[in-house]
Amino acid sequence: MSTIQPSAAFLYDRVQRLIPPIEWPAFAGDIDAILDLKRQRNAVILAHNYQTPEIFHCVADIVGDSLALARKAMSTEADVIVLAGVHFMAETAKLLNPQKTVLIPDLRAGCSLADSITAEDIRLLRQRYPGVPVVTYVNTSAEVKAESDICCTSGNAKAIVESLGVPRVIMLPDEYLAENIAAQTDVEIIAWKGHCEVHERFTPADIRQLRENHPGVIVLAHPECPPDVVAEADFSGSTAAMSDYVERQKPPRVVLLTECSMSDNVALQHPELEFIRPCNLCPHMKRITLANIRSALEQNRHVVTIEPGIAGRARLAVERMLAV
């Protein structure tokens, strides 16, 4: 273990099942620097479940799905928030912490869902469906949130839709999430045509092949997957719900139909279980690295700003969600 740098060595135990000792020195220097920079700047790192293990397990202070990160962002006492995730997540953290410095390590960390709809699209939808509330997935820009009545995540979408007490809602931008929620509620849902480039690639045939190759495997699917995939799965839920399912049920053999690193991170927490790992990478999440987290903290790079008129309205939509 002589290759392990001393001050980061205690963290290696968390990831040694995935990162060979020979590779650790490539990470350890950045990890040491990040830990020091966090102390110097009173900074906190919020990391989404899709971040790679060396980020998720070694430098992150708060981890979780979009809903968990939004809630935790509200209560942090740090002066600086680094969002190890994609841009809409950093914007949400800024909306909830307007007086704090929020950094995103790479400005190119976008989202296919967020790119699928604009504020003008929502204004046109409101003209077409006057009086129908707009429920917007948090996987959207601040401009889109500002045109919405309330936000939701994959973990609370059904509760949000039903909390409005109306017979019909517009739910955007994820078409598959909207269809999967529509199957669980009597509320009529008008959907948009956005898709997650990770989850839309899973198919029912994939599940059948997994079951054939790995008898007894329990299949967990994210609700951004197509409805026919969700129907073939044993369970569907947000990344937090999938993690909770594994923790609670302890399936001996399990597959998570979501982004690759989610399986890596949960598997590290459950070495007694067998994880089958079909790998659909999110290229946007993978733009976040230890090196650019370090640079963001060292140079105060990529400060997230939101135009005040947009921020106030977008914040209201997020706060309404958090109040449900």
Swiss-Prot record:
Pathway: Cofactor biosynthesis; NAD(+) biosynthesis; quinolinate from iminoaspartate: step 1/1. GO terms for cellular component: cytosol. InterPro entries: NadA, NadA_sf, Quinolinate_synth_type2. It catalyses: iminosuccinate + dihydroxyacetone phosphate = quinolinate + phosphate + 2 H2O + H(+). The keyword S-adenosyl-L-methionine does not apply. NCBIfam families: nadA, PRK09375.1-2, PRK09375.1-4. Its cofactor is [4Fe-4S] cluster. It comes from the Bacteria. One of its GO terms (biological process) is 'de novo' NAD biosynthetic process from L-aspartate. This is Quinolinate synthase 2. Iminosuccinate binds at residues 48, 66, 137-139, 154, 222-224, 239. Keywords: 4Fe-4S, Cytoplasm, Iron, Iron-sulfur, Metal-binding, Plasmid, Pyridine nucleotide biosynthesis, Transferase. HAMAP family: NadA_type2 (MF_00568). The keyword Ligase does not apply. It is found in: Cytoplasm. It comes from Mesorhizobium japonicum (strain LMG 29417 / CECT 9101 / MAFF 303099) (Mesorhizobium loti (strain MAFF 303099)). Catalyzes the condensation of iminoaspartate with dihydroxyacetone phosphate to form quinolinate. Its EC number is 2.5.1.72.
